Amino acid sequence: MDAISDPTFKHARSRKQVTEESPSLLTVIIEIAPKLWTTFDEEGNEKGSIIKVLEALIVFLNAHLAFNSANKVAVIAAYSQGIKYLYPESTSALKASESENKTRSDLKIINSDMYRRFRNVDETLVEEIYKLFELEKKQIEQNSQRSTLAGAMSAGLTYVNRISKESVTTSLKSRLLVLTCGSGSSKDEIFQYIPIMNCIFSATKMKCPIDVVKIGGSKESTFLQQTTDATNGVYLHVESTEGLIQYLATAMFIDPSLRPIIVKPNHGSVDFRTSCYLTGRVVAVGFICSVCLCVLSIIPPGNKCPACDSQFDEHVIAKLKRKPVVPRLKAKKKVTKP
């Protein structure tokens, strides 16, 4: 029996070892301007929609951490006066929180028996969002409410680049998720086109897909749809906050490596128009600066590019300002018969 069985075991090929799944970094950009969500509540006859979004976001982050013990998350808030890293906290924020007399027991609404990683993320988010809401109360009466979503996206890609360079031993898959709210007025005029295009170029080079979840408002968002289309991301429009966690758990958990072979829940048509640097209007045909590729719907005053301050050629400007000339048709001469 030994003579029969030994060669079998000697020549048997060993099975391939199952490789562990590479960890993933999920960076979430959430827009929490109070006036934006107040307008959304008034249009949809809802109440406390931002709280429902935050609850769904916390469950979504916990689910991402549960997939792999090496997974990482980061949350950046875009509010009316700037951006703020909610998680992980910066070193200066940690020192400031330690020096304060208030402890986390004042805001401790998380179950103490929860998994440690879940509890750390949940408690930090609840505390930082509470501080941010208190800060926004003082600024709510100001009329200047600008969108800082483009800056938050740029900061998120910067964080992804830094974390990817730090993890040299293991390959880290990264993706960006943008949670924004739509109102009755078009928000494309508020967005800055050039910063968003810079984010698209950076994400494409880093191979970091950008997913967008737009809650309420119009289904179309020109620049955000262009962002998801160029970076192989998912654009999802949700009418209300009801069932948001189900949308996040189904559409936003698609692995980047599987997206080329999976039908993504995107809209069929994408508007690839750009916006004018001066007026902010979305245009299909316009003037382009040959130096910085700035798009203009009108000829700028002074014949200078408003973005790079390049001087345009006077002969070219004269040709552009020249109105089309319609040639007159020559009257046919009547031929008289003899």
Swiss-Prot record:
* GO cellular component terms given for this protein: nucleotide-excision repair factor 3 complex; transcription factor TFIIH core complex; transcription factor TFIIH holo complex
Q: Which Gene3D superfamilies match?
A: von Willebrand factor, type A domain
Q: What is its main location?
A: nucleus
Record InterPro entries: TFIIH_Tfb4/GTF2H3, vWFA_dom_sf
Q: Does the keyword Plastid apply?
A: no
Q: Does the keyword DNA damage apply?
A: yes
* Protein location: Nucleus
Similarity comment: family membership? Belongs to the TFB4 family.
Role description? Component of the general transcription and DNA repair factor IIH (TFIIH) core complex, which is involved in general and transcription-coupled nucleotide excision repair (NER) of damaged DNA and, when complexed to TFIIK, in RNA transcription by RNA polymerase II. In NER, TFIIH acts by opening DNA around the lesion to allow the excision of the damaged oligonucleotide and its replacement by a new DNA fragment. In transcription, TFIIH has an essential role in transcription initiation.
Put simply, this protein is called General transcription and DNA repair factor IIH subunit TFB4
> What are the leading ranks of the lineage?
Eukaryota, Fungi, Dikarya, Ascomycota, Saccharomycotina
